[in-house]
Amino acid sequence: MPKYTLPTRDALLKAMQVGETSIEAAEYMATRFEQILTKAKLLPECNDMLEKIKEYAQFVKFKLLSSAQVWSGQERPTSDYQNTQENKAEFLASHLEGLPSGLKLEVAIGDDAKILRGFSSNGKMVEGDQLKTMDGLLEGWLAKNSLAISGGAVVKIDNTGNQTKVDPQEIRQLINDSEKGVAKYFADKGVGMEVAQRTYQEPKALETKREEIRQEIESGAEAPTTQSIR
């Protein structure tokens, strides 16, 4: 019975480079690698590497989403900030025709309260007016919790429009709160939204992450051979 070698280190590294070009390429890379391991019945032995590849693909996806979807929020340091944003959210919620299914928000809060976010629908980037709608609703959620975006970071805002720093851990916990969280707010507006928090990464983190996985790959042994899995 013919034998085939699973992807070599060089092949995996090249696949990672290709996977950085688009969300679809990143997801395909991870999915294809898992399929190969499954068919070869080598999933248990290579599961650690698979998890690394999946982590990298997810990281690339979030980076591409957050960099392509420039935050569209407007700073409104006024006394009626909450009312303005809530009215805007209500208006957007009443005009949801044609909204795609499988919506997902991936969000990361840095230790300095910097925020990155990306919206997708069934793995594809949300764009145009639909992105504006999603951002508008997210701004409504922030305002409802006396929060706003200033200089790319989340800040507290009071009734007079004064801004103060906020504990990033409080924001992270609030995002996932069952009663006050983002998913609940979107659901109340009639929008099903999966919410996933990611680790905040600085702009050069992709290169760092790539180097970490490259070292993991190069420090390991070549994958064993197995029967044909084509």
Swiss-Prot record:
Its main location: cytoplasm. Keywords: Cytoplasm, Protein transport, Transport, Virulence. The keyword Cytoplasm applies. One of its GO terms (biological process) is protein transport. Residues 204-217 have a biased composition (Basic and acidic residues). InterPro entries: DotY, DotY_N. Residues 202-230 are annotated as: Disordered. It comes from the Bacteria. It is found in: Cytoplasm. Disruption phenotype: Deletion of the gene leads to a reduced intracellular growth in the protozoa A.castellanii and decreased levels of effector translocation. Deletion of dotY results in the absence of both DotY and DotZ proteins in the coupling complex. Deletion mutant shows significantly reduced DotL polar localization. The keyword Aminoacyl-tRNA synthetase does not apply. GO terms for cellular component: cytoplasm. The T4BSS is a complex nanomachine composed of several subcomplexes. This subunit is part of the Type IV Coupling Complex (T4CC), a subcomplex composed of the DotLMNYZ core and the IcmSW-LvgA adapter subunits, linked by the C-terminal tail of DotL. Six DotLMNYZ hetero-pentameric units may assemble into a hexameric nanomachine, forming an inner membrane channel for effectors to pass through. Interacts exclusively with DotZ. DotY and DotZ are co-dependent for the assembly into the T4CC. Component of the Dot/Icm type IVB secretion system (T4BSS), which is used to inject bacterial effector proteins into eukaryotic host cells. Part of a subcomplex which recruits effector proteins and delivers them to the core transmembrane subcomplex. DotY and DotZ play a role in effector translocation, but are not essential and do not influence the stability of the subcomplex main components. The DotY/DotZ main function is to optimize secretion by modulating the delivery trajectory of the IcmSW module and the localization of the machinery to the poles. This is Type 4 apparatus protein DotY. It comes from Legionella pneumophila subsp. pneumophila (strain Philadelphia 1 / ATCC 33152 / DSM 7513). The gene is dotY.
